[in-house]
Design a protein with these regions (language model features):
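Specific aromatic-rich, kink-prone transmembrane helix
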Residues: 83-100, 111-115, 264, 291-298
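Short helix- or helix-capping micro-motifs
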Residues: 60-65, 92, 116, 120
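Cytosolic-side transmembrane helix boundary signature
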Residues: 142-150, 294-319
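Transmembrane-lumen/periplasm boundary regions of multi-pass, lipid-linked membrane glycan transferases
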Residues: 1-8, 14-21, 118, 122, ...
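Transmembrane-helix motifs of polytopic, lipid-linked glycan transferases
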Residues: 31-51, 89-93
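C-terminal luminal/periplasmic domains and tails of membrane-associated envelope-modifying transferases
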Residues: 350-632
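Membrane-interface transmembrane helices that cradle and orient dolichyl/undecaprenyl
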Residues: 90-108, 143-147, 565
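Short acidic/glycine- and proline-prone juxtamembrane loop motifs at membrane-interface regions
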Residues: 75-82
């Protein structure tokens, strides 16, 4: 990443005397991003004007402005919105250069230079634009030459000269705003593109109701996310191009339309070829969406012209478009704090996406949660010190007011590990939660729920209060080996909060310490009822089944878990143990080797391996495991 946006934003904040802990800093950044978003809407409208007419320009601007995902990100996203601004601005100016290719205007060349450089300074994908724009330009030029057969058209060499200035200038400008790239501009830009193609971070994401790794998403990930989160008017506009294809391309300017179409489709081709890691829906491809909006507007303009040709009322086309835009507009008005949490009617709105797709993946609702704690008198200048735990620490920490910030100890914890530490209040964002758990308990159904943050009545985050301390005391007693106390506390917790799957798991673990595996199993089954994909619950369920001699059920549960969590050393270990107990030594050997590959310092894995290979009569591999164990 470069500093195309961060540098001017930081300089302006410094001039205004804003520090990192000031709320005003975040307001300033929101305003600057909104300005870039407004210019992006303007660019979309201008492209629509050059592809059709002023009505087409209005259609494009309307669709983009009332796109909840785009509008929401235009206030919060310091990477994808600046990049979309640079990308669409570059598309506009390259279309203008192509339109006036015989004598390009200097203002268009300068505009392309600035937008290309700005996009490159924000994200290395700007370098990809250099190649893509050449491809798009040649596509438009080739079509123009083919259709007109005009000897007046410039040769490819002249085109290279025309584009050489903005391309070279844009590259230099972009690198100047990217301090890291100044060391070795060419190689570092290429390196960053390679990193994007094979993104090294793999996080858990919710897609189609299943937890996946961002590095292993299917090819349907991007088209699915786009189709269920854009306004229906956008989809309809693209579909309208099909029946009115001849009208659109006959009316022209055909070469400009082809050029923009290449810019629109090329990113999809890149994703299919490079297969990069994807997460957070399509926010990384906001530039792709904004490029497609003028094309969708072309479809609506062609439909409106067809209506007029039929001598029907000329307002029918705009009214139909307007009616389709009512639904996203109402969503924006109702949820102006976080309009980007939007799903269209194809998936049943936000309620249909609940537990199936990530909702507030940016964690914006932490602001509303902090402000709710202020309204309820929890956070104020004269408050007593508290511990506030959250799974989105940055958003919470940076919205605490200065007058009480030093009295709030903000701690990070995963939602599934929320009882590993003591806390007074908690703010939980639904991101990274198991969708099956959210739907099973109708999250947040906890007795500790103090206030849910909702979008169209669907919760996206929740404030918890500590409430009764049963589960905290029970977990502490379990960890310290005070089993009878743990059982008492956890039984009280389940009476207080029946759907607390962690309490059921802890109680099962406590009862298992007494040797009552039947009762322990019942608690693990209840835990899985409320959290079917909880790894620890699955493993404890399998342990209980193994101890009861039901190896087939244990293996089935572990195999299903390992399909999603293939790096679970515990899963592989108990799968090996189940097969070992059942006498399936070959499979046990295979799984125990996988165990120590996943976690090489796991002593029980090496110990079980010794037993397996000794029973197989394979003393050589038993000695290898024995030697490795001695080195730990």
């Amino acid at each position: 990443y470069g500093a195309g946006y961060e540098l001017p934003a930081g300089m302006l904040a410094s001039i205004l005397g804003l520090e990192d802990e000031d709320r005003g800093l975040h307001v300033l950044r929101n305003i600057l991003l909104a300005i870039l978003g407004a210019f992006t809407v303007l660019f979309a409208g201008l492209i629509g004007r050059h592809l059709s007419n002023w009505r087409g320009a209005f259609f494009a601007a309307l669709i983009l402005f009332l796109s909840p995902r785009f509008l929401g990100h235009s206030f919060i996203n310091p990477r994808d919105i600046p990049f979309a601004f640079g990308f669409l601005g570059s598309a506009l100016f390259i279309l203008l250069i192509l339109k006036n290719f015989e004598k390009p205007r200097w203002r268009d060349i300068i505009g392309l230079t600035f937008c290309l450089g700005f996009a490159l300074s924000v994200r290395s994908g700007g370098a990809l634009m250099l190649y893509m724009f050449f491809l798009a330009f040649y596509a438009g030029l080739f079509f123009l030459q083919f259709v007109t057969k005009s000897p007046k058209l410039p040769k490819i060499g002249n085109v290279l000269k025309t584009l050489g200035i903005p391309v070279a200038g844009g590259f230099i400008f972009g690198v100047l705003l990217w301090p890291y790239a100044l060391k070795d501009p060419i190689n570092i830009v290429l390196e960053s593109l390679a990193v994007f193609s094979e993104y090294p971070v793999s996080i858990r994401i919710l897609f189609g109701g299943e937890l996946l790794r961002s590095s292993d998403v299917p090819l349907t990930y991007l088209p699915t996310w786009i189709s269920i989160t854009v306004p229906l008017a956008f989809i309809a506009g693209l579909l309208l191009i099909v029946p009115y294809f001849k009208r659109i391309f006959a009316n022209g300017p055909t070469y400009l339309i082809i050029c923009l179409t290449v810019m629109f489709l090329a990113p999809f081709g890149y994703v299919l070829l490079s297969d990069p890691g994807l997460y957070d829906g399509w926010r990384h491809f906001t530039f792709f969406y904004v490029t497609g909006v003028p094309l969708a507007a072309l479809g609506w303009e062609a439909f409106s012209q067809w209506v007029e040709d039929k001598n029907w009322k000329p307002w029918i086309g705009p009214v139909v478009l307007g009616l389709l835009m009512v639904e996203p507009a109402v969503h924006i008005a109702r949820n102006y704090q976080y309009p980007y949490v939007y799903f269209n009617p194809l998936v049943g709105g936000v309620s249909g996406a609940f537990g199936n797709y990530e909702l507030d993946y940016w964690g914006i609702s932490t602001r509303q949660a902090v402000e709710e704690l202020e309204r309820q008198g929890v956070l104020h200048a004269d408050m007593e010190p508290i511990v506030l735990v959250t799974n989105f620490r940055y958003g919470v920490q940076n919205w605490l007011a200065p007058e009480y910030r030093d009295k709030v100890e903000v701690e990070y914890a995963r939602y599934r590990e929320r009882y590993e530490l003591e806390w007074d209040y908690a703010i939980w964002i639904s991101r990274f939660m198991d969708g099956t758990h959210m739907k099973a308990v109708d999250w947040p159904s906890s007795t500790r729920t103090m206030h849910p943050i909702t979008v169209n009545s669907t919760p996206i985050s929740a404030i918890y209060k500590k409430g009764e301390p049963h589960v905290f005391e029970g977990k502490k007693a379990l960890d310290e080996g005070r089993i009878e106390e743990a059982i008492e506390h956890l039984n009280n917790e389940i009476e207080y909060n029946p759907k607390n799957y962690l309490a059921h798991r802890f109680l099962g673990m406590s009862v298992a310490r007494t040797g009552d595996w039947e009762t322990a199993l019942s608690h693990f089954e209840t835990s899985l009822k409320y959290a079917p994909e909880d790894q620890a619950a699955v493993i404890n369920y399998a342990i209980a089944k193994i101890n009861l001699g039901d190896y087939s059920d244990a293996k089935l549960a572990l195999h299903e878990m390992l399909e999603t969590f293939s790096n679970s050393h515990g899963g592989w270990y108990y799968l090996a143990l189940a097969n070992f107990r059942e006498g399936e030594l070959s499979l046990a050997a295979q799984y125990i080797q996988r165990t120590v590959q996943v976690r090489q310092d796991f002593r029980p894995g090496w110990q079980l391996g010794i037993q397996i290979f000794e029973q197989m009569g394979d003393e050589q591999r038993a000695d290898l495991f024995r030697n490795r164990l001695e080195q730990l």
